[in-house]
Amino acid sequence: MATERYNPRDAEPRWQQKWNEDKVFETDNADPREKYYVLEMFPYPSGRIHMGHVRNYAMGDVVARYKRARGYNVLHPMGWDAFGMPAENAAMERGVHPASWTYQNIASMKAQLKAMGLSLDWSREFATCDVEYYQHQQHLFLDFLEKGLVYRKQSKVNWDPVDNTVLANEQVIDGRGWRSGALVEQRELTQWFFKITDFSQDLLDALDTLDQWPEKVRLMQKNWIGRSEGLTVRWEIVPETAPAGETEITVYTTRPDTLFGASFLAIAADHPLAKDAAAKNVEIEAFCEECRRAGTSLAALETAEKKGLDTGIRVRHPLDPTWELPVYIANFVLMDYGTGAIFGCPSGDQRDLDFARKYGLPVVAVVMPSDGDAASFAVGDTAYDGDGVMINSRFLDGKTTEEAFNIVADRLSAASLGNTPVAERKVNFRLRDWGISRQRYWGCPIPVIHCDACGVVPVPKTDLPVKLPEDVTFDQPGNPLDRHPTWRHVTCPHCGKDARRETDTMDTFVDSSWYFTRFTAPWEAKPTDPEAANRWLPVDQYIGGIEHAILHLLYSRFFTRAMRETGHVAASEPFKGLFTQGMVVHETYSRKAGAGREWVAPADIRIEEIDGKRRALLLATGEEVAIGSIEKMSKSKKNVVDPDDIIASYGADTARFFVLSDSPPERDVIWSEAGVEGAHRFTQRLWRLISEAAGVLSTVAAAPASEGEALAISQAAHKTLKAVQNDYDKLWFNKAVARIYELVNALAAPLTKVAAGEGDIAYRAAVRDAAEILIQLVAPMTPHLAEECWATLGNTGLLARTGWPRFVEALVVENDVVLPVQINGKKRAELTISRDADQNAVTDAVLELDAVKNVLNGQAPKKIIVVPQRIVNIVV
């Protein structure tokens, strides 16, 4: 009888070495079995993994191990999203080269991930900063360029003067750079773009096919793509107010039905008319500059105070040339959406209403709800932006909004301004082409050359890779490639004259937009092996954070389509199933208050509870510190737990089991020492029960019982097996944990009985069968412990190579059935009764139900109709 405690410090490295030696998790592309590709979003090599990583990779590993046991050929690779600004910041702060900083971090994090016992195919590992990876990215860029999916243009960009780089709109917070905090400037730069807008409609339509994605993510992408059907309307400028050479303003609108409610036009600060006005007026120039400095993300625009300035320009209403409207420059109009000009209908749009009230502009209600009263309907502080019936709209009065839309569209399309229709129907998208140029060193070089004679010349594919030079310095801001004495100077591949390399590098989102494809054949001399890519793609289960719901996932969807168009893959969608897991959160602790507040790490405090009141005390001094809110683990608030500490104290299996057990996987998990200790106690209990009975169980073959004392044991095990199998299929890890706890409780007494030498052969065989099922159920979550238990029962093969158990159908059939009971066709109760009960037994049991007695009130029913195993209907 084994009595020693389970020692993860001994067992975990031993089993990891065994898996590694046997190459258990290396995947053969030629394996003919059905494929299953599971992938967690690969990490940025920051230097340390955190508990969020542990949860993410533990989830993926459960799926990989489970599917492997179910007989699939599983691909479960790992790599590193290794380019980006932090490496350059480290180079500037510490004088270390970005490459050495990055590869040191990769080595540290790889050791941490290996200690978790993840079933990863490390033979396919790469970092996106490996030349062997990014040379293929350069190849793809050139293929996209040939296909017309890449172009270069002058573009207004958000420029961070501290980081000396371009920022996406989403990276500008309250007019400042998200990383540096510097006031962002607007600059005109020549940028490289991917033509993601070529696929706008397809990217939108295909969302309907992604039925294994969270609805929330699909909705976020739908809104980001932002398809709208509307009208471009040309407004004639009143000649006396027109700037030289200007005769009209074109507006895009999705609500032409509300034109009679118009009270102003608004243009973006970068609209040509605004620029013209700014050149002549200092006040307008200052206002336009203020608009440019503000955040340009949708969230920033929605929350900012609505401001405008009258340009003095007036336009004629397209449906009534005697009606003139003012033209404002407004801070909520973007040049890169629609035409950079809108008409304001204050009664139908809250933003326009706020603006009109602020500047004393007319507010005319033109749409009311279908059941409204035209005589009394008015707009107060809230605009009415719904559909309904037209009012105060002349020939449109009484029409529905849909009818009015079409009447206006037809009328204005038939009318002319000059020799061109006043309006035309147009489908618009909010989605913009993807600007990939970044003015930094640590990224994939863009493989083009600039020649004064030939213009922009692609680097010949035979000359790839364009490697980053290693001899660079970071002693001043800006891009070291611009300052390099030799790297940028080359000869033109066309004419042989002196030329210059492109010094911009690619947005790091490019690196992560196709890495999942490279994993299918990372040794290939071309970007992909189409046969391997077509076999493995799409990824069956992709797991990562909701923060990547839009950009990374949308860019990956674009890239897969672009790679399809250029012959690299057959798939259109990269990820068949998507799961977005919650974060790992922790209490915060702090000393002092206000500006002098100091955050305290969980490792530096102890919690004591007296009379139901919790207190946090500093370990060093006993000083009480404040317990704050539960928040995402972050270094700034020190509420982090180091996975290395947990693994050293409790073992990897305990850490894995806890992050999977405590809450539904899509929700945040609250880290608690008590929860971790509970998970650790479970691993110890499981080992004790199995190891103490192992001496006896190893002498019998596993066999489920079909009768007698052991039948209940086999039923519990096989019912749990069926249920947990369903839980794993649906990624309900916490439900699986709850069922496993129940099964351990059910098997505790039988295992103890067997350990004491009791029970006949059939009983012991049933207990062994149940114990093996239990071990196989926990194996995806606690693989080291499971291997140890499996081996102690005398099994010789690796559990990691063992197939999934099969439940016996007869053991999982429920003996009871729940029958709805109706009285005169209305459901009044439910009856739980044996499935084998005859009609008389059902009738007798129904009449004993309190709900039935209350309705009958002592009367005998006319008739009782029993549909076996379906329903009971009483006729009164």
From Swiss-Prot:
Keyword Zinc belongs to the record: no
EC number: 6.1.1.4
Catalyzed reactions per annotation: tRNA(Leu) + L-leucine + ATP = L-leucyl-tRNA(Leu) + AMP + diphosphate
GO annotations of cellular component type: cytosol
GO molecular function: aminoacyl-tRNA deacylase activity; ATP binding; leucine-tRNA ligase activity
PROSITE patterns: AA_TRNA_LIGASE_I
Motif stretch ('HIGH' region): 43-53
Entry keyword S-adenosyl-L-methionine: no
Sequence motif: 'KMSKS' region, positions: 632-636
Pfam families named in the record: Anticodon_1, tRNA-synt_1, tRNA-synt_1_2, tRNA-synt_1g
Record-listed ATP binding positions: 635
Family label: Belongs to the class-I aminoacyl-tRNA synthetase family.
Protein name listed in UniProt: Leucine--tRNA ligase
The organism's taxonomic lineage, starting at the top: Bacteria, Pseudomonadati, Pseudomonadota, Alphaproteobacteria, Hyphomicrobiales
Gene: leuS
